[in-house]
Amino acid sequence: MAKKKTMYVCQNCGYDTPKWLGKCPGCGQWNTLVEEIVKEERNVSRGLNLGLSQSSTPCPISEVTVEDLPRMTTGSQELDRVLGGGIIPGSMVLIVGDPGIGKSSLTLKVCANEAALGKKVLYVTGEESVRQVRMRADRLEAVHNDLLVVSETNLENIEHHVEKLKPDLLVVDSIQTIFRPDIQSAPGSVSQVRECAVEILRVAKTNGIAAFVVGHVTKDGTLAGPRVLEHIVDTVLYFEGGSNSEYRLLRAVKNRFGSTNEIGIFEMRETGLIDVPDASKLFLSERTDEAGSIIVPTVEGTRPLLVEVQALVAQTPYVPPRRTSDSVDIKRLQLLLAVLEKRVHLAIGACDVFVKVAGGIRIDEPAADLGICVAMASSFANRRLRPQTIVFGEVGLSGDVRAVSQAEGRLREAARLGFTSAVLPRKNYEQLKGEKALTGMKLYGAGDLTEALRYAMPRE
């Protein structure tokens, strides 16, 4: 008979200890250790066969046959883009996001799309009743006879339904509400989340079922529960977007079967999440040519995306001055301000600086450095920028402008939307001299920040 012992497990990182501690040694959080009863099993293998290998004997990697993995399209081009072309049968996808951001709406819409293609779909809800799911399905126009719904939180009962129905797609909403009866801890605890996820993954891989699992987030936007959950699943998708914005970004932070650089853009409407295939045109539809506003072509994976960077620089009598941005990392913003003051001799250190990206988009790539600097300098000098111009490039600490990747794709996207000129790194300019006829744009190659500002802000 298995012995029982008491352990204190951190609900944030999964660290366990036989005695209670106020501060978790693993993650440094306070009051996160919760008492859990753990069974000790003897002479039992704790390994998990995920069903990925056909043989347990070692073989040369050159003899391993590689075949194209079949994919199920989800009916959403944006979601398929993030997944790498669709979801693979036998894989497990974790979707994480703030409450009300659209996780359940997206998964229910995917279920309806698969059911319409003749696939058998099982939607397991642990947070709502089947009536509530039906009401949302009516609003999303996602009612189909092959879409089966059950309200269940007991993992053993869920496994029974899966074995009986043999669905092609399984959705569990959410993993924090599911529990195993043989584990004596509350649903959502580290032990429950870990063991339930492992069991769902085993069922999915054994039966070749594509599985979507919805997860909650903490107040700082990270996955609620143990980080080991992200290691168990095949793909982790994070929903981004404020409650005051109708646009949602779906970003892959882990993907065993595709790129982690792709993003999907959706618009939240009354009928659910709608794909936004031409996001650049949408984000620039309300732009005005004012000082401090510049267009920056960013790249997410293979997708060029034009965004409007806005900067406001104002004198302030208060010390220290404020630096505020929800769209750009603050440390990066402070670095660019220091470069402007040291290398371009702008007396910007005593000013309040506010930077944002229209549409609630967050930009992290270095190629946006030059655009941010130009926008701040334009606002500081109160001078308009060259009309119909895009700006991109990485800025070094010495004030030099460095080359970035996929410059041609950025220019082609800008030319498609009617932009006529671009300020870009000199090295990219030299590489693209012969491409001018292809883009139809006038290119300005800048070697340093001062030269870029001279091109972007011509004297009136």
Q: How would you name each of these model-derived features?
A:
Residues 2-12, 16-83, 88-96, 101-108, ...:
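Peripheral, non-AAA+ core regions of ATP-driven protein-machinery
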